Amino acid sequence: MATDGASCEPDLSRAPEDAAGAAAEAAKKEFDVDTLSKSELRMLLSVMEGELEARDLVIEALRARRKEVFIQERYGRFNLNDPFLALQRDYEAGAGDKEKPVCTNPLSILEAVMAHCRKMQERMSAQLAAAESRQKKLEMEKLQLQALEQEHKKLAARLEEERGKNKQVVLMLVKECKQLSGRVIEEAQKLEDIMAKLEEEKKKTNELEEELSAEKRRSSEMEAQMEKQLSEFDTEREQLRAKLNREEAHTTDLKEEIDKMKKMIEQLKRGSDSKPSLSLPRKTKDRRLVSISVGTEGTVMRSVACQTDLVTESADHVKKLPLTMPVKPSTGSPLASANAKGSVCSSAAMARPGIDRQASHGDLIGVSVPAFPPSSANRIEENGPSTGSTPDPTSSIPPLPSNAAPSTAQTPGITPQNSQAPPMHSLHSPCANASLHPGLNPRIQAARFRFQGNANDPDQNGNTTQSPPSRDVSPTSRDNLVAKQLARNTVTQALSRFTGPQAGAPPRPGAPPTGDVSTHPSVGRTSVKTHGIARVDRGNPPPIPPKKPGLSQTPSPPHPQLKVIIDSSRASNTGAKGDNKTVASPPSSLPQGNRVINEENLPKSSSPQLPPKPSIDLTVAPAGCAVSALATSQVGAWPAATPGLNQPACSDSSLIIPTTIAFCSSINPVSASSCRPGASDSLLVTASGWSPSLTPLLMSGGPAPLAGRPTLLQQAAAQGNVTLLSMLLNEEGLDINYSCEDGHSALYSAAKNGHTDCVRLLLSAEAQVNAADKNGFTPLCAAAAQGHFECVELLIAYDANINHAADGGQTPLYLACKNGNKECIRLLLEAGTDRSVKTTDGWTPVHAAVDTGNVDSLKLLMYHRVPAHGNSFSEEESESGVFDLDEGEESPEGKSKPVVTADFINHANREGWTAAHIAASKGFKNCLEILCRHGGLETERRDKCNRTVHDVATDDCKHLLENLNALKIPLRISVGEIEPSNYGSDDFECENTICALNIRKQTSWDDFSKAVSQALTNHFQAISSDGWWSLEDMTCNNTTDSNIGLSARSIRSITLGNVPWSVGQSFVQSPWDFMIKNKAEHITVLLSGPQEGCLSSVTYASMIPLKMMQNYLRLVEQYHNVIFHGPEGSLQDYIVHQLALCLKHRQMAAGFSCEIVKAEVDAGFSKKQLLDLFISSACLIPVKQSPVKKKIIIILENLEKSSLFELLRDFLAPLENRSTESPCTFHKGNGMSECYYFHENCFLMGTIAKACLQGSDLLVQQHFRWVQLRWDGEPMQGLLQRFLRRKVVNKFRGQVPPPCDPVCKIVDWALSVWRQLNSCLSRLGTPEALLGPKYFLSCPVVPGHAQVTVKWMSKLWNGVITPRVQEAILSRASVKRQAGFRQTIAKRHPSQGQQAVVKAALSILLNKAVLHGCPLPRAELEQHRADFKGGSFPLSIVSSYNSCSKKKGESGAWRKVNTSPRRKSGRFSLPTWNKPDLSTEGIKNKTLSQLNCNRNASLSKQMSLENDVSLTLNLDQRLSLGSDDEADLVKELQSMCSSKSESDISKIADSRDDLRMFDSSGNNPVFSATINNLRMPVSQKEVCPLSSHHTTECSNSKSKTELGVSRVKSFLPVPRSKVTQCSQNTKRSSSSSNTRQIEINNNSKEENWNLHKNEHLEKPNK
C-alpha cells in the first residue's frame, strides 16, 4: 500500500504537460527522505494519510459484505411477506427442553405488531397532511414575499429616480440663489444711488417751497393794501353818486309838488270843497315826515359791481352783473347827505367798481326795494311812525363792529309811479351758487368768519369785549344794540320749529343759546345807515385771507351749515307768533316779512351729484300772521351743482346773499297788474290760508329774493312741492320757462332732483323740454346724470332731444354712462340715441363707462339692441341677454355679436387713449375682458406717447391680454362606451370636460404635454380628495397618483380633434398653428379600459379605486368562484360585468378564445336550468371528454331571488375540486345519467343584493370566495362622495367651488342623507332595507337651484326608500309572532301596532336622516315637506333644519318638541291609530281595500266604546305589541328619537329605561304613546326614553284629574318636551316579564310622548 502510494506521488505532483519527463526523472533519481524539502514532506504526509483512509474503507466494505452473506445464508429461505414463518422458525429453533421458546404465541405477537403498524400509519398520514398544509402556506408566503420584493425593487428604483431629480433641482436652486444674491447686491447699490439723488431733489424742492411761500406772503400783503385803497375809493365814489341821486330825487319831488300845487289852485278856482284841499297838504306832510324818517322813497336803481374777482365756472364768458340799490332822498331833509351815504354798501364785498375788473355772477349781491301801495295813513304809521312819535333816527341800526354786517333795509314807498321801475336781473342767482362753497369770494369769506364771533364772546384773555359801534350822529345808537339783537333773537326763536339746524351740524362752541346774530353767517360788511347817520364809517379792511382762489386750489374752510339772514332795520310794535310763543318785538324798522334760510353746505364736483339734504325757505310775517304749512309741506332737496360740469377744484362759485325782501313789488317782467293790492283773493291765498300781508310776497311775479335762488316756481319744482307747483301753474301770465342766471328752468330743477310728478306737471303745462342752461345741459341731461330713470322716460316720451350735446359735448347717454345709471342707459338706447357721439375731449360713452369701471353700462352699450318697432325688451330678456356675460359660453353674449363697430370700440380720445387703454391702466379686468370679446378690438394701437394697451396695463390685465389670442381648447376625459345600460351604469357619463387649455402662439409641444399631464393630475386629485379643495391647494401635493389610483399613466390615447397624439410627441407646426389648421375644437383623453386588459376607465366611471378593482380581478383569476354581495344598489352587476370584460380581453391577448355567458336568476330559476346552462356553455363537460382550451366566464345575477343552497347544492363539490378524479353524476331528462366535471378554464361569478346571508345559504359560504360590498366600508363608503364631486367639477368646467358654495352644501347634504339613512336602518336591525350608493348617483347638480335636488330627494324617498323601509319593518315585526302562512297574512293585514311602528319609523327617518341638515331655509323647506310621504306624522318637531354648518353631535335643536304637559285622569282617550292615512304615510300594500275594511271596522268599534270606561280595558289586545321584535323596534325608535341628533346614530349610546305597563286582567299590555308629563325642569342628558317592557299611560287632557290609571292615545314614544328622569327610574331590569305593574309617582319627572295623528295637542285641565 505504501509502495503504491509512493508510486502515485509523482502523478499527483507533476503537471499534465510534462508528465512523461517527470516520470523519467523520478526513475533515475534515488528516493531520499532527508533530501526532501518542506513542501515535499507535506505532500508525502498527505499521501500517506490518504493511504490510511483508503485502507479503512476497504476494511469496512469487506465487513459489510460478510454481514450480507451471513444473513443471506441464514435467513435467505424466509420471505418478509410472510412474517408468521419467521416467528414459527424462531419458535421451533428454540423449542428444546432446556431453552425457553423465544415467543409463546407467534400469532399474538403478530397481531400486536399489526396494531402498532396501524397506529404508525395513522400518525404518518396526519403528519403528512400537516406537512402538506405547511407546504402550501410556505408557497403562499413565498409568493407574497416575491411580490413584496418586486414592489420593494420598484420603490427603490423610484426612490433613486426621485433622488436624482431632487439633486438636479437642488443644484438649480443653488445656482439660482447665487444669481439672485448677485442681483440683490446690484439692486441695493442702485437703490443707494437713487436715494442719494432723491435727497438732493428734496433739498432743492424745500428751497423752492420756501422761496415760493415768501413770494406769496409779499403778494398777499400788497393785495391787502390795494384792497384797502380800492375800498376807500369805492366808498367815496358811491357817496358822490348817492349825493347826486339825492339831488335829482329832490328836484323830482319839487317838480311833483309844483304840479300838485298847480292842481290845487285849479281846484280852488273851480270852487270845490275846502276839505279835500286841506287833507292833501296833510298827506303830503305826513309823507314828507316819513321820507325824513326813512329816506327811501322813490326808487332809483343804480349799479354797483363787486370788488374782488373770483375764478368763474367757465372762463370763456364772464358777466358783469350790477348791484342794484334804491336811492331816494326826502325833500328838504337836513339829513339828506347822511342818508345818501347810508344807502351805500360800505363793505368791499358788497360794492366795488364794475368797470375795469370782471365779476362772476356768483360774486354779486342784489338789493331791490319794491314799493308797497298804502291804503291809509294808519298803514303808513305801521312802517314809519309820525314825527311826534318817531324815536331817535339812529335807533334803526345797532352799533356794529367793524366787521359786522347788518342787512340792508328799506321801507316801502308810497307813490304808485314807482311800480314802473325795471326789474333787476341781478337778483337771479344761479341754483348752483345758492350755497356757500369753499371757493367763494375771499372778502365775503373773511367778513363771514369775522361776523361769526359774538360781540359778547370772550377774547383770548377771557375778557368780554365789544367791538366799537359805528360812528353815528345819534348818541342813543349804543343803547339800541340790545333792542336790535333782541328783535333778531325773537325772529330766530319764532322760526326755530321750521329752521332748526341739521342733524349733522352741532352748534358752534361759544355761541349763545338764544341764537343771536353772531351765530349766522354775515352778509358782508354793509353798514347801511338811515337818515340819522352823519357820515359813513368805512371800517377796517377785511383780514388777509390765507390763500386766494387765484393762487391756490386749496378750498377754504366750509361755512356753518345753518345760516339765518334777517333783513330788517325796524319793526312795528306788534307780536310775532312762532313756535307756539308770542314774543313782543321791540321798536325797530322790521319790514313786512323776514326771510330765514336754512342752507346746506353743497358739495361741488365735476359731474352731477345727488341732491343734498332738504333746505327750508320761510317767510315770516311781522304783523302777527301765522305762516301756513303750505310753504313747508312738500319740501324737497335744493339742487346741487349744475350737471356735467367738469370744473377744476379752484373754480367754486362764491356765496350769493340777497339782502332785500320783496314786499309787494310791482317789478314784474310778465305783468305789472299781477301784483295789485287785491291779490289776496287769489287761489293760492285762499287755499293756503295765508294772511293778506304774505300774499303779495308769494304772488309777486318778480324775482324771488330767497337767498339768490330761482323763482318760487323753481323752488317748488326743485323741492318736489306738487301742491304749490300746481297752484302756481294755474296762475295766469306765469312764465314757466323762466330761467335763472345759470339757465336752470323749473323743469330742469325738477328733473335733476328726480321729482317725476313735478316733471309731469310742467310737461303737461307745455314747458320747454329742451331748454338748456348756460353750460348747455338740458333737463334730460340732468335726469340721466342723476339716474332718475322715470324722469328720463317721461322726458323721452315728450320728445326730448336724446342726442343733445352740451357745451363740452356731453350727451345724456354719456352722462348716464359716466355715473353708471344702467336703467337710464337702457331707456336712451331703446329710444334710439346715438352711441357714437363724442365730447370735445374725444371721449365716447364707452370711455365714460370704462373710466368708472361700470361693467353693466359697458355691456348695455356693446350688446343692447334697439327694438325693431320701438318695442322695448322685456325685463327678462334684458336681464338674461345683457348681464350674463360672466357665464362664458352659456350666456347669450357668448353667442350673440356686439352691436357696436370696431371703429367705435377703437376710438381714441385727445391723448390717443382708447377705452381699452383706460380699462387696462385702471385695472378694470372685467371691462377689459368685455372689450376683448369684440373681435375688432385693436390691442396694439398706440397712444400719443407710443404706448400700447399692454404697456399701460396692470399685472392682472397684462395676463388677460396675453391670453387674449390664446386658443381655449376644452380638455375632456372619455371612458369609451359603457354597456350595457342595465348594469347600473345609467348615471355614468362617457365624457367629462375637466378644464380648458390656453394655447398661445409661443406655446411649445413640451409645454403642451406638461399642461395636459398637469391638468389630468389635478383633476384626478380634485375628484378623489376628501374635501372641497381648490386646485391651488392640491398642487402643493407633488404626488402623481391620486387616491383612486389614476394618473397620467392611465391614459390610453389622446386625440387633438381627430388627430391622435401622445404625450411628448411633437409635430412640425406649433400647437397653436396645429389646432387652427386641423380645426381642433377639443382634446379628448381616452383612458385604458377592459379592452386593453386594464381597469382605469372602469375606475374613473365608477369611482371605485383602481387597486380594489385589480384585487377583485386577481381573486377571480385565482379562485375561479367569486360571489359579490352587498346591499341593493351596490353596483355588483356593473363590477362583475367589467371584470368579465377585462378578464376576457386578457385571455384573448394570451391567445385563448373566451366567452361570457350571463344568466339572470329569478324565483322560478331551477337547478335543471342551471345544469343546462353549465353544459351548453361547455363549462361542465363529461368525464370521457378531454378538457377544452376555451375560457368560459359564467355570470349569475340576482342570486338573492332564489335559495342559494337549493340551487347550487349539487355543484358545490365539483366546483371546488375541478378534475376528472372528482366527478359528479347528473341525471338527464331521458332517465340516463352521466358523470360531469368542471374544467380549470371556467370562471364563475355571482351577484347577491343582500347585506348578509341567512339560514341554509350559509352552507354555501365555504365553497366560494366572497367579496362583501359594505355601505360603511370601501369602496362603497367613498364612492358616492367621489362621484358627486366629479359631477360638481364637471358642472363648474373643471373648477372646484369653495365649500361655502350652495352646490357643495346640497351635495354634502345628499351624501349625509345616504349615510344617515343606512346608519338608522342598521340600528333598527333591518339590513334588508339598506341602500347602496347607486340610487343616489342620479342626484342632480344644478348651480343656483337647490330646490331641484330636494324635489329629486322627495321622489327617491317616495318611490324607493319608503316601500323598502315599510317592508323591512313589517317583516321584522311579524317574524316571531306569525310563522308560515300566517306571516303573509300579517303582511297583508298589519296590526295596529305594526302600522304605528311603520309610521313612526318613516317619520323619524325622514326628520332625522333626510330633512336634517338640508341647507334650504326653513320656510322654503317647509314648502317641500309635503312632497315627502310619511312626513305628516305628528312629531311636531320645531327646529331649524339648516344645520349643515354644524359638526356632528352639535345640532340638538331639531328634537325640541313642544307639547303641553298632561295629568292623570280617570277617563281614557281612544287611540287614533285605527284611522291611518295611507296616502300620506306612504304605506304601500297590495291589499289596500282589505286594509280599509279593517280600518273602518276598528273605527266603528272605537266609536261604540267611546263612552264606556269599563270596556276600554279590552282595547289592549288590539293595540298591544305583538312580538318581542316589535317591541325591540319601538325601543330602537325611541332611542333614536331621544338621541342627541348625532348624524351617525350608530355612535349614540343606549339610554333605555323601563317602559312602564299596567296590567289589565292578565291581558297583553297596552302600548302607550304619551307619558304623563309633570311640569318639571329638564336637563339635556337626562332623557327618559320608552322601553318595550313597561308602558306609562296618560289620559286625554279633556278629562278631569282623578285617581287611578290613565289610558293612552298613541303608540310610539316621541319626546314632546324635555324633562328630567323620574327619580324612581332604575336601570333596565333583567326580567322579561311583560305584565309587571309599577305605580306612577306623581312627583316623577318623565317624558311626554306623542305619536297620535292630530298635529295639535289639547291643553290639560288645571
Curated annotation (Swiss-Prot):
The modification Asymmetric dimethylarginine is found at residue 497. It comes from the Eukaryota. PROSITE patterns: ANK_REP_REGION (PS50297), ANK_REPEAT (PS50088). Residues 118-275 form a coiled coil. The modification Phosphoserine is found at residue 1523. Residues 1644-1662 have a biased composition (Basic and acidic residues). One of its GO terms (molecular function) is protein phosphatase 2A binding. Residues 874-891 have a biased composition (Acidic residues). Residues 385-395, 1623-1637 have a biased composition (Low complexity). Its main location: cytoplasm. Residues 1-23, 202-235, 365-439, 453-477, 498-615, 871-897, 1446-1473, 1614-1662 are annotated as: Disordered. The keyword Coiled coil applies. SMART domains: ANK (SM00248). Interacts with CTTN/cortactin SH3 domain. Interacts with STRN, STRN4/zinedin and MOB4/phocein; this interactions mediate the association with the STRIPAK core complex and may regulate dendritic spine distribution of the STRIPAK complex in hippocampal neurons. Activation of glutamate receptors weakens the interaction with STRN and STRN4. This is Cortactin-binding protein 2. It comes from Callithrix jacchus.
